[in-house]
Amino acid sequence: MMAAAVEEEEMVERMHGWARDMDVASRRAEEEAMRRYDAASWLRSTVGVVCARDLPDEPSEEEFRLGLRNGIVLCNALNKIQPGAIPKVVQAQSDAAGPTDGSALCAYQYFENLRNFLVVVEDLRLPTFEVSDLEKGGKGVRVVDCVLALKSFSESNKTGRQASCKYGGLSKPLTARKYFILKNTDAFMNKIMKGHSAEAIQSEFSEGQSIVTDFSIESNEMTTSDSLSILLRKVLLDKKPEEVPLIVESILSKVIQEYEHRIAIQNKMDEEEQNLLNITEQVNHVVVNGDGEVKQFQLEAQTNFDVQQKQIQELKGALSFVKSGMEQLRLQYSEEFAKLGKHFYTLSNAASSYHKVLEENRKLYNQIQDLKGNIRVYCRVRPFLPGHRSLSSSVADTEERTITIITPTKYGKDGCKSFSFNRVFGPASTQEEVFSDMQPLIRSVLDGFNVCIFAYGQTGSGKTFTMSGPKVLTEESLGVNYRALNDLFNIKAQRKGTIDYEISVQMIEIYNEQVRDLLQDGGNRRLEIRNTPQKGLAVPDASIVPVTSTADVVELMNQGQKNRAVGSTAINDRSSRSHSCLSVHVQGKYLTSGAMLRGCMHLVDLAGSERVDKSEVVGDRLKEAQYINKSLSALGDVIASLAQKNSHVPYRNSKLTQLLQDSLGGQAKTLMFVHVSPELDAVGETISTLKFAERVASVELGAAKANKEGSEVRELKEQIATLKAALAKKEGEPENIQSTQSSPDMYRIKRGNAIPAFPKNRQPMEEVGNLEVRNNATPMQKKASFQFSGVLSENNSSDLAENCNGIQKTDRMAVGNNQFENGNSILELEPGATQLPTFFYQRYDPDKQRRRAEPVETDDSDSFDAATSSPSDQEMLLSTSGLKADGIASRGAFIIKKPQTKNTKITATKIPNLAMKSPMSEKRLQTPIRNSKQLPFSTTGGRRTRNGKINTPK
């Protein structure tokens, strides 16, 4: 009986040990979880939820390890406790990467953070851990201990006293250990006492619980089997004998169940052991068989190694051979490269020489153009507009001086037509390229030449863009106007020590055949174009503003552009509805010699020709288009007449041709920009424009001449003007004598006959630089037959004669053998001689002129006052063919006819001559006789009638 009880007691003790092991493991896992939760909670509260977003509030061991393995949370927590402990914390590369994918930081980055953290923790003498503890399979308990020690250290720093737990884990009070013991006891007792009466079990368990509750901390160190034995003895000691079998039976049933369970486990373990033995036998068999295979593999490997070793030796030999061959090739190529370098050097020198020769040829070509006086024509192709790019272009090819147009069959058989000009700019050309090619022409204005640049083409072809630029200006998009003026002011600054320049600007427009001033806001006052411009001013009534810098000119141009007539059509949303002209007047004075020079530059932006069916204009826009096309048609007629060298040039058909008369027919350097559009639907207008440009390029104007005059000539002209004013005042005439700065339509008398001075008969180049009174005379419009009907009288007042005594000898007029020789004036004033001539000219008879075979005639024959020209700055040309001889006064005074307009009576004005002390006063003019039809001047003062008879005045 007692032996059975002992066996049962031993069985119970074994069962209790097994249960105790399970409970201890469970308790330990729960304790570790609580410590881990505490550490995670403290880290989240210390560094913040955002920084510790990868660390849950109650993490598992794997989540805790992944949340701390990059070291960011640990380093930030340590910096919170010890500011600046870790100066640099390597942050994650991407916040978007999850913490569990293993790609947030590279191994080096989180190893750097962890190493810095462990160094600081070790310096603080706190528990540390290894970096491998944060890897999978590491000891996470040491990490938790380190975090909790850091927490205790932080709390001690805050409170100023040492914490209850010295840098360890959670502090466990005594009640906690009692709690776990009671819990384990309850589990065991519930297991072994099931099935007994509730009252007995409860009473006995209460006694056992009271005993266990009184245990001290030292009694908890006792083994569990001893305590259970004592407990069972106490329970069975007081029981009745009849109750013991029931209790023992219950315990035995439980033991039997446990035994059967263990037997099942043992059987399973035996099966696994048998399987393990089988596997071991198989492994041994494989090992035994594998020894032969290994030996065979080693033999094959050795053989392969020997073969590869041999191949390596062969490769080393081949490499040595290749190296020697490469060295030879290197030397050979070095020699070849040296030869190529010399050859390229020769080619580069040849190319440089070629470019120099090409530049010299261009300069020579420009000089030839200057000598011939051809109008230079530059062609520019507009690029496609944004959003309107066509699939194909009408421009087939562009070269330096040639443009080829794809034409329909009606324009050519081969489908292409080429045009040649002085320069051709493609669609990709810039404003800088366009201006650089014409820059020498611009600079000649400061040398005293007149220059005219005008843009021609259909509407929307880019004329305003070339001349002015786009609506929003940039440094790269500035047009010809701005760049030309900027260049003028730069040269002015460079020559300020030699020449003193004064620059002034005019800006006008021709709108519906009306000349308007663009520099006056709201100024619709109609201006007139003078056929004999004074001081280079074709429109003297327009505002002329002095300028000193490019900024002043830009401001004036902006004001003019605002006042210019601009409208929108179906072809162009910013179409110019008028012709604009920017005139830049330059007057310079040499600081050393005092000589004067004068130049003028006209920058003309023509309105584009347009077809009404395409532009879809109505009303005022239609009227504007009609005026524009009419003026451009008149320009075409003028160009055609000049190209064919016709005797009649219709300048007066339009205000535009009147304005350009001095540039097209005078002594000026002229450049025309012709613009074409690349669209296929505009090929008709393109070909028409290019044909017109070809006609313009064929016009020869003769060599241009600089407007220069010496200081002595200028002083003499001023004296003559003063004397003329005094004479006019004395005779009671209106003081309308003006400074002689331009040459009217006069005739130069040569030996034997009279030759009209036409614009194309310019002075030779050797006379260009002479400092004499040469001005841009307005071309003569019609050849007038003038009658020289008076000479200076000899009975003038003595006071005027005294005013003329200081005039030096400036001109000479030799009379005899039908010859006039002209220097700077008609008459030669010797010392002591006094002459005050005033010439008047009679308008010729058109009918009679057509009956006679005369030289070239022009269209502009407006009368002008002879007082506006002086004998000191003009070359007088007299045509004696068909002259009407006026009677000469008996006392030697000539009667000279003034020019008359239509339906105006011809009046004669007698001008007395001053007393002449020189032999000049004794001479009489002899009229040169060209042919038998000419009649000599009558010395009796009579005049010839229509039938050839001479009426003598009574």
UniProtKB/Swiss-Prot annotation:
Q: Where is the composition biased (Low complexity)?
A: 864-873
Name this polypeptide is given: Kinesin-like protein KIN-14Q
Q: Which PANTHER family does this chain map to?
A: KINESIN-LIKE PROTEIN KIN-14Q (PTHR47972:SF31), KINESIN-LIKE PROTEIN KLP-3 (PTHR47972)
Pfam families, per the entry: CH, Kinesin
Query: Spans of biased composition, class Basic and acidic residues?
Result: 844-855
Q: How does activity depend on pH?
A: Optimum pH is 6.5 for ATPase activity (in presence of microtubules).
In this protein, which residues make up the domain named Calponin-homology (CH)?
33-155
In this protein, which residues make up the domain named Kinesin motor?
374-699
Q: What is the lineage of its organism?
A: Eukaryota, Viridiplantae, Streptophyta, Embryophyta, Tracheophyta
Give the compositionally biased regions (Polar residues): 928-954
- Give a short account of what the protein does: Minus end-directed motor protein that transports actin filaments along microtubules. Plays a central role in the polar orientation of actin filaments along microtubules, and thus a contribution to the organization of the cytoskeletal architecture. Links the actin microfilaments with the cortical microtubules in both cycling and non-cycling cells. Required for efficient cell elongation by its participation in the premitotic nuclear positioning.
- Regulation of catalytic or functional activity: The microtubule-dependent ATPase activity is regulated by actin binding.
Residues annotated as binding ATP are 457-464
Coiled-coil annotated spans: 704-733
